[in-house]
């Protein structure tokens, strides 16, 4: 498998990216919203296999204090190949020099991210657009 990596936004098919998140499965993400999010991200990577988008990730970063890795996804056909690990490693490498690198991930993947040195934070809090849904999905709790 020969993969092509890029951080360029110029040839991204935002509908294809939306379909990747749906298939991963990481939910429904609007193509226009994805374009805004990735365009606003300091670091990003898109991975192609034979012109098909198979993996993606991004990080919001300020260049000094904090880099925030999020929206990492791999197409099911390429899950288990080490691609997700490579995407995270690439974003961590790009984020080097920041005082902290924060990661947002789906529940149940903590062991995977510990391999990169990530530790669970005890001080993080969030306000979601739909607090009840976030609670239902286990993303937040009352404590």
Regions found by a protein language model. Give the residues of each.
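Conserved acetyl-CoA pyrophosphate-binding loop and the N-cap/start of the following alpha-helix
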Residues: 47, 78-87
